[in-house]
Amino acid sequence: MSESPKKVIVGMSGGVDSSVSAWLLQQQGYQVEGLFMKNWEEDDGEEYCTAAADLADAQAVCDKLGIELHTVNFAAEYWDNVFELFLEEYKAGRTPNPDILCNKEIKFKAFLEFAAEDLGADYIATGHYVRRADVNGKSRLLRGLDGNKDQSYFLYTLGHEQIAQSLFPVGELEKPQVRKIAEDLGLVTAKKKDSTGICFIGERKFRDFLGRYLPAQPGKIITVDGDEIGEHQGLMYHTLGQRKGLGIGGTKDGTEDPWYVVDKDVENNVLIVAQGHEHPRLMSVGLIAQQLHWVDREPFTGTLRCTVKTRYRQTDIPCTINALDDDRIEVIFDEPVAAVTPGQSAVFYSGEVCLGGGIIEQRLPLTV
């Protein structure tokens, strides 16, 4: 008697990657069902229309593939475990990455638990561009085969136990191949553009959105030499290395370097700027990271040579990690790096393998 196929619940977002993931798993012999997660309570017409369209696309794909689509509302979990922390970080003058938190708390926690306990799933699957490999009895997280779309940076908080319960079908493909499969299958999502913006909140004017929840506090813009040259509308709207949207204009004759944000004085509500994207005040020789997550779930001790990304799509930076007390590490770069931003994540790699990462607590500036 043959064994019944393993059941996989695919997180269906209404996008092309999850659509093709569902089909690929069908081809591999799994019993596939979809789950559409509603993680945000829309409060205006535009938001509602986007969410409704995504659900309709997910349903159309599932109908085409002949699979059942479940829906679940995780809006309360998202608000409590992602959004409130996101606002707290902005209030503190840091720049958080909500997509990482959303993966940790929603997609690979709330969704994983719901799929296993309520839907009887053996695995969950998502349309992330990452791969998994089993080494010495532990599942490892690998970069996606398409280096341009690799999303391992956003999944570093996952432990080997979660990865063992997760499948990433498109991680073995390149994006154009995924779109070609969707076109050949006649899926409505084939030409749908990739979503951008905050995880589950979608594409909207970020400044307007943030302003709904946090009151703006205007303050001075000063240069590194102490000259006041303008006014900002709120530190939360600015991040290190930012050039656009400062409202201080360019240089008079257009020959000098443009202004960049090099620091935020949260205590005094002052934005500090300098000219040139390689200004010494913008450069860091390293960083201190906290809230560490290692994929193998082993505590880190001692010293390690590896590479690090301090933001998504950044070229890997060779570095040395030194363990500090209290679950913190010091990271020293081989060469100075621009715009290392507190609140963002530092993610570590050994070749193709994502080792884990942590939140940047502070940068170690090139100049003090």
UniProtKB/Swiss-Prot annotation:
Gene3D superfamilies: Adenine nucleotide alpha hydrolases-like domains (2.30.30.280), HUPs (3.40.50.620), Translation factors (2.40.30.10)
Residues given in the record as ATP binding sites: 11-18, 37, 127
Top-level taxon: Bacteria
Single biological process term from Gene Ontology: tRNA wobble position uridine thiolation
The enzyme's E.C. designation: 2.8.1.13
Pfam families listed in its UniProt record: tRNA_Me_trans, tRNA_Me_trans_C, tRNA_Me_trans_M
One GO cellular component, as annotated: cytoplasm
Region (Interaction with target base in tRNA): 97-99
Major place of residence: cytoplasm
Site description Interaction with tRNA, residues in chain: 128, 344
Disulfide pattern: 102-199
Family: Belongs to the MnmA/TRMU family.
Record-given protein name: tRNA-specific 2-thiouridylase MnmA
Native organism: Salmonella choleraesuis (strain SC-B67)
